[in-house]
From Swiss-Prot:
The lineage of its organism: Eukaryota, Viridiplantae, Chlorophyta, core chlorophytes, Chlorophyceae. It comes from the Eukaryota. Gene3D superfamilies: P-loop containing nucleotide triphosphate hydrolases. GO terms for cellular component: motile cilium. InterPro entries: P-loop_NTPase. It is found in: Cell projection, Cilium, Flagellum. Keywords: Cell projection, Cilium, Flagellum, GTP-binding, Nucleotide-binding. Transmembrane segments: none annotated. This is Intraflagellar transport protein 22. PANTHER family: DRAB5-RELATED.
Length: 192
């Protein structure tokens, strides 16, 4: 089984559930109650392993702060990103403009294809909460893959399973692009 590594930047406005998602995926403890929201200072990195077909993939989630206070760090954090997961609060469609800024700063400098980018609306919910009715993106980013996931911080397993059903598509797209880039670099070396 071949092993590969992927760097996935997880970006979006503040308080959209980026850290909750990353911690849940990495099976890390999730804070509840008064201490449940702790703003990310610049970046948090979580790692997971996935098996995609014949490939074992070590995924690093770079959970990037949504605060403009850390915007000067974005070029460094965006360096060599293999994929981009943009997170939005489905109850705040005005955040779509913010996602366009993240796209320009993370996807465009890395020449990411649409298969390497995804928008995920995360509904943080309590037991028994419904999924709501997010209508998806309406602007320039509507060409990207979009998903909607509900996560209950007290019991995130169902939300994690749903998230993986979408994220595996992102991982496969990022892995395919990475393999193609490696193959191209090998071909160029042979030509010299």
């Amino acid at each position: 089984m071949a092993e590969h590594g992927l760097k996935i930047a997880v970006v979006g406005p503040q308080r959209t559930g980026k850290t909750l998602l990353c911690r849940a995926l990495a099976e890390q403890p999730i804070l509840l109650g008064e201490m449940s929201y702790q703003p990310t200072a610049a970046v948090r990195i979580q790692e997971i392993s996935r098996v995609l077909g014949i490939d074992r993939v070590k995924v690093q989630f770079w959970d990037v702060s949504g605060s403009v206070q850390y915007q000067s760090y974005w070029p460094v954090l965006a360096k060599e990103v293999d994929g981009l997961l943009m997170v939005i609060d489905p109850n705040r469609p005005e955040q779509e403009r913010d996602l366009e800024t993240f796209y320009r700063n993370f996807a465009e400098p890395n020449n990411l294809y649409t298969r390497q980018c995804m928008v995920m609306a995360i509904q943080v919910q309590k037991e028994g909460g419904g999924l709501g009715g997010w209508q998806g993106l309406q602007g320039g980013l509507k060409k990207l893959s979009q998903s909607y996931v509900a996560i209950n911080p007290a019991n995130p397993a169902a939300g994690v399973q749903e998230a993986y059903s979408h994220l595996d598509v992102l991982f496969q797209g990022a892995l395919q692009s990475k393999k193609e880039a490696l193959e191209s670099s090998y071909m160029n070396q042979e030509d010299q």
